[in-house]
Amino acid sequence: MRTSRRSFLSGLTAMAGVLAARANMPAPRPRHDPSLAVFISDLHLNGLKEEVPTHLYEERCFCEAVGKIMALDPLPANVVCFGDISYHWGQPEDYVLAAKLFQPLLDAGIKLTLGLGNHDRRDNFLVQWPSYAKSTLVPGRIVSKVEMPHVDLLMLDTINATPVEKKKRSHPGECSKEEYEWLAATLKAATKPVITCSHHKPNEDKVGLTNLLHGSAACKGHVFGHWHRWFRDFLHVGWDPQKVFPISCLPSTGHWGDIGFATFRTFPDRATLTLHQYDFFFTGGPGDGQPFRDDIVKEKNGQTCTFRLV
């Protein structure tokens, strides 16, 4: 069968139209946004259900948080945990449960970085996640760096030397001499802005980071957990008006207090932390926060804290 010259030219014209249409189509959006991270804190997951049967709701609440994170479009490139993964004593069973509940995030290609809180124990944590013993930036502590396009996150380890045994817990935080010296050298050598992170507030107990962070040109702010409620504040040394150092506290994913997580989005000149709060309750679990729950969630959800990077 012979093709006429007219048919041949018509085919070329149609093909050119298809190619032109494809050229004008927007490129597919990446599944993960490298400028977006999610911050979670104070999970308090209970792997010993028979021993603490009244605290099973933390697992359900954390699964709800994971579902909301997985519904973000695009997905965050990073999820950063600010500690208190364990319910109370850093039991191995708590970390086994946590690893199971983290898996959907990992399966979705999200990088997970874990920090420790006062209810965690390094030895049992490292049994479940042994890679942190090699990757830590400060031997003997669990210290990590998360690199984002416009800022680096430094996750510090502020848990103290509390014994592993039950009923010998301690809420205060501390920063070891070695970690403090490492942080001072790292901030001095930094070539891009830094946000420091920890479970405890930087000026709380023996953490003692106020002067170091306030005096650093690279450090632009600090984010922490522990208090189970969202708030924004600032650090200052004396009454020096030259630098306001913003800090922000994260909610719990489901133990008590403000319930939710925060998204952290970076831009060339700033980074914005945004609260995603969808519940509030006390230690009785979901439903224990009435009649204040609706008012608190409505007032707080969507609040932001801005860190200026330049």
Positions of PLM-derived features:
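N-terminal secretory signal peptides and thylakoid transit peptides that target proteins
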Residues: 1-16
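Boundary at the C-terminal end of the N-terminal hydrophobic targeting segment
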Residues: 21-23
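N-terminal active-site segment of His-dependent metallophosphoesterases
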Residues: 25-93, 185
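Extended active-site neighborhood of metal-dependent phosphoesterases/phosphodiesterases
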Residues: 29, 91-182, 208-221, 232-250, ...
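Active-site neighborhood of phospho(di)ester-bond hydrolases with catalytic His/Asp-centered motifs
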Residues: 40-41, 79-83, 111-117, 195-199, ...
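Solvent-exposed loop/turn segments at secondary-structure junctions
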Residues: 43-46, 85-88, 118-122, 159-162, ...
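Short acidic, glycine-rich surface-loop motifs adjacent to enzyme active sites
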Residues: 185-202
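Acidic, His/Gly-rich catalytic cores of divalent-metal-dependent hydrolytic chemistry
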Residues: 270-310
